[in-house]
């Protein structure tokens, strides 16, 4: 149960950077290309879609887990999301449209472990302890979200702010650190 709980913490840590900062990052991407005003609504829509992709991503991750096994699926999703988060900071060097499409792809990948880890946890928990088990599991996930968001923001500030590519690369790299440290 500890491994599944830490895996969930890593999943939330790795997800919050993308989900919480996507609109600001896309604003930066548009500004890098000399745009901004015309992409305004698409930034908000892309941000909303990244959040909504958690549902099908979680379902797909759970289905893969049933077919390939929880360990194999969780590891594959961790590696794919670590790679996606690490490289996503560099997306600002691409066109705004490409960055938005990559945001959707990364948003899907990083949320792929939600359901399979939760169902795996419930499968191994004692029936009379499931409520407490899920409560602790949720609290550690939220702690990962808090720490990940805080460190993401600190990385942005320490490396020059939201108007610098290096700051975004380091901040998205923080998502990788969370996955490696707890996963």
PLM regions with names:
Residues 80-85, 175-182:
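MFS 12-TM fold signature
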Residues 36-38, 154-177:
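A membrane-interface helix-boundary motif in multi-pass transporters
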Residues 2-55, 148-149:
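Extracytoplasmic gate region of multi-pass secondary transporters
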Residues 69-117:
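C-terminal transmembrane helical hairpin of 12-TM major facilitator-type secondary transporters
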Residues 24, 116-124:
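Intracellular helix-loop hinge segments at the cytoplasmic ends of transmembrane helices
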Residues 124-160:
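A late C-terminal transmembrane helix in Major Facilitator Superfamily
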Residues 56-70, 156-157:
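Helix-to-loop junctions at the C-terminal end of transmembrane segments
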């Amino acid at each position: 149960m500890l491994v599944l709980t830490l895996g969930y913490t890593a999943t939330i840590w790795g997800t919050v950077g993308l989900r919480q900062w996507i609109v600001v990052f896309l604003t930066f991407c548009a500004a890098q290309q000399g745009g901004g005003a015309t992409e305004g609504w698409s930034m908000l829509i892309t941000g909303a879609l990244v959040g909504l992709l958690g549902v099908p991503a979680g379902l797909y991750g759970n289905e893969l887990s049933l077919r390939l096994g929880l360990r194999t699926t969780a590891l594959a999703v961790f590696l794919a999301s670590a790679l996606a988060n690490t490289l996503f900071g560099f997306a600002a060097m691409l066109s705004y449209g490409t960055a938005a499409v990559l945001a959707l792809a990364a948003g899907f990948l990083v949320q792929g472990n939600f359901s399979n880890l939760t169902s795996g946890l419930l499968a191994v928990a004692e029936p009379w302890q499931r409520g407490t088990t899920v409560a602790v599991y949720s609290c550690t996930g939220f702690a990962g979200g808090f720490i990940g968001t805080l460190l993401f923001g600190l990385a942005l500030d320490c490396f020059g702010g939201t108007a610098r590519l290096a700051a975004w690369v380091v901040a998205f790299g923080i998502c990788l650190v969370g996955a490696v440290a707890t996963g």
